[in-house]
Amino acid sequence: MAAQVVYVAAKLGLADLVTQEPKTARELAQATKTHGPSLGRFLRALVGLGIFTEDEKGRFHHTPLSETLRSEPVRAWAVMLGAPFIWRPWGELYEAVVTGRPAFERIFGSIYSTIWPRTQMIARSSTPQ
């Protein structure tokens, strides 16, 4: 779960949006074109993980952890590691152990015909939307 939370935060570019001045969930929702109440709950999950802090006015501030998600190169890694081609095979681990067939190939086909195009897609999508 935490990996997906970090992935979404990186994909939305939240750490870059909470710059020198703290932002409210509403301000961040407008900047990211996301659903305000959902983003507010999501930001509180990030607070729970120590990635941001929230003050009494509902503004979100950086922590040392959130600073690592600002721009490149760490944000790109967080986006890549949260991508479906990384996490989906773990859901098939049991089948892989039982059958001996690699989970990645079961889901996506050949690693060589799948991984390189997806790597390019992720590189392009690491820029906040």
Give each language-model segment a name.
Residues 1-129:
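Conserved Class I S-adenosyl-L-methionine-dependent methyltransferase catalytic core
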